[in-house]
């Protein structure tokens, strides 16, 4: 699983020029699901995501979590995070999960985030989406297998 987490002041996602998800202060999550990922993998990243302290406190230190600031999530599926361009110039996506399995884990990820009490908006799995956001910082973090070592 790979997550690109962008701290935002606001964001939205549109399909066919219609906004289908919109948040104020929070995170835009670009979520890539690999072929080896499981619900346990998702649980690990959800726990890490919801506890990340990357919002500033009164002293300007990144000490506050999404919950601390009543932040929201906009979760966007993005299999292209599994692009492998090591051979040639056209990326391969062989390490991305198959669409059916990826959608099931994506839905699970979103459901578990909602169960935490966090407001969650989403894109449309597999659709061509336009994501607009106002970065806050910018502050962007990538979570992937390397954090488990």
UniProtKB/Swiss-Prot annotation:
Keyword match Cytoplasm: yes
Signal peptide (residue range): none
A GO-annotated cellular component: cytoplasm
InterPro entries: Daa-tRNA_deacyls_DTD (IPR003732), DTD-like_sf (IPR023509)
Localization of this protein: Cytoplasm
Reaction(s) the record says it catalyses: glycyl-tRNA(Ala) + H2O = tRNA(Ala) + glycine + H(+); a D-aminoacyl-tRNA + H2O = a tRNA + a D-alpha-amino acid + H(+)
Gene3D superfamilies: D-tyrosyl-tRNA(Tyr) deacylase (3.50.80.10)
Protein EC: 3.1.1.96
GO biological process: D-amino acid catabolic process
Keywords assigned: Cytoplasm, Hydrolase, RNA-binding, tRNA-binding
Molecular function GO terms recorded: D-tyrosyl-tRNA(Tyr) deacylase activity; Gly-tRNA(Ala) deacylase activity; Ser(Gly)-tRNA(Ala) hydrolase activity; tRNA binding
Major site of localization recorded for this protein: cytoplasm
Motif Gly-cisPro motif, important for rejection of L-amino acids: where in chain: 137-138
Similarity comment: Belongs to the DTD family.
Subunit structure and binding partners: Homodimer.
UniProt xrefs under NCBIfam families: D-aminoacyl-tRNA deacylase
PANTHER family: D-AMINOACYL-TRNA DEACYLASE 1, D-TYROSYL-TRNA TYR DEACYLASE
Domain notes: A Gly-cisPro motif from one monomer fits into the active site of the other monomer to allow specific chiral rejection of L-amino acids.
Protein name: D-aminoacyl-tRNA deacylase
Organism from which the protein derives: Lachnoclostridium phytofermentans (strain ATCC 700394 / DSM 18823 / ISDg)
């Amino acid at each position: 699983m790979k997550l690109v987490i962008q701290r935002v002041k606001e964001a939205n996602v549109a399909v066919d020029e219609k906004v289908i998800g919109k948040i104020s202060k929070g995170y835009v999550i670009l979520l890539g699901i690999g072929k080896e990922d499981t619900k346990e993998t998702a649980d690990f990243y959800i726990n890490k995501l919801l506890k990340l302290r990357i919002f500033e406190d009164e002293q300007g230190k990144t000490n506050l979590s999404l919950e601390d600031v009543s932040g929201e999530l906009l979760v966007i599926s993005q299999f292209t995070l599994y692009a492998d361009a090591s051979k040639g110039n056209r990326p391969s996506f062989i390490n991305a999960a198959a669409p059916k399995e990826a959608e099931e884990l994506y839905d699970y990820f979103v459901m578990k985030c909602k169960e935490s009490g966090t407001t969650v908006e989403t894109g449309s799995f597999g659709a061509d989406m336009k994501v607009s956001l106002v970065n806050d910082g910018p502050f962007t973090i990538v979570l992937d297998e390397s954090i488990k070592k």
